[in-house]
């Protein structure tokens, strides 16, 4: 359901907490866009933040942990069971952050993202059961901060993946991807989502242009995502439409 993710747009919003913010929060900001250089660093960050959130943690620690669990599930998990645990732990951490700071758009984003990925990994029926929760979080994030670029990737992929009878809409998916790209043209996950949508609507030449732009991008917002997710997916999609017009 997702093609996402993060980059500079994912600034961890400071929220009032009883404890001091862990220095690991700042490190997450760096590693989240360079994890391809040393994926094992995600293990250490996960473990360190798990220790930091014991007791009465700072909301920023919980948000950082939710983010790391999501990336870890995508990149480090070796089995479906490990992925499910990672996304579940991520949404639990984000839920705790929301309890402390209900207007923290970043906390809500990671709650929605982990929830959506958990449902997707669990299977179609579970994913659809969680759909209202994800949709409500998207609406809330857009109300809180319409400049939160990553939420447009999440929203676009939800509109793209969900059946039309349940709210899926390729036109709205395209609109969400374009809105995100207007804010950050180098957010390659958005461009991959746009390319997929254009393929599904039969606009092959336009899709090919967008997907080639992903491969040609020399300064992606998130280099790690571009390296391990967006570029490989763009190549696969381009191969899939080879010879089509």
Task: Show the residue positions of the predicted features.
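Terminal, low-structured helical/coil segments at or just beyond the last alpha-helical repeat
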Residues: 200, 206-245
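N-terminal leader/linker segments that initiate helical-solenoid repeat arrays
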Residues: 18-77
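Conserved structural position within tetratricopeptide repeats
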Residues: 50-54, 92-99, 139-143, 175-182, ...
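TPR alpha-solenoid repeat register
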Residues: 59-61, 107, 151, 190, ...
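Short coil/turn linking the two alpha-helices of tandem helical-hairpin repeats
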Residues: 31-39, 66, 71-80, 117-126, ...
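"A position-specific structural signal for the A-helix of alpha-solenoid helical repeats
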Residues: 26-31, 64, 71, 110, ...
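Structural signature of tandem alpha-helical TPR/SEL1-like repeats
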Residues: 39-43, 78-92, 125-137, 166-179, ...
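Short coil turns that delineate tetratricopeptide repeat
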Residues: 56-57, 102, 146, 185
């Amino acid at each position: 359901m997702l093609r996402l993710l993060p980059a500079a747009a994912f600034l961890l919003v400071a929220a009032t907490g009883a404890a001091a913010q862990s220095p690991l929060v700042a490190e997450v900001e760096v590693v989240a866009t360079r994890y391809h250089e040393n994926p094992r660093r995600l293990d250490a960050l996960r473990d360190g933040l798990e220790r930091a959130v014991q007791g009465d943690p700072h909301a920023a620690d919980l948000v950082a942990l939710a983010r790391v669990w999501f990336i870890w599930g995508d990149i480090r998990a070796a089995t479906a069971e490990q992925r499910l645990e990672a996304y579940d732990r991520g949404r639990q951490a984000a839920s705790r952050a929301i309890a402390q700071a209900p207007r923290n758009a970043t906390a809500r984003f990671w709650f929605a993202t982990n929830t959506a990925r958990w449902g997707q990994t669990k299977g179609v029926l579970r994913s659809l059961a969680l759909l209202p929760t994800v949709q409500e979080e998207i609406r809330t994030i857009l109300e809180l901060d319409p400049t939160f670029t990553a939420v447009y990737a999440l929203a676009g992929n939800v509109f793209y993946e969900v059946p039309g009878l349940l709210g899926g809409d390729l036109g709205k998916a395209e609109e969400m991807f374009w809105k995100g790209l207007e804010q950050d043209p180098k957010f390659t996950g958005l461009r991959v989502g746009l390319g997929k949508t254009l393929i599904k609507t039969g606009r092959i030449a336009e899709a090919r242009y967008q997907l080639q732009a992903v491969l040609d991008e020399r300064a992606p917002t998130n280099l790690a995502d571009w390296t391990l997710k967006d570029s490989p997916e763009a190549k696969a999609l381009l191969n899939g439409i080879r010879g089509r017009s």
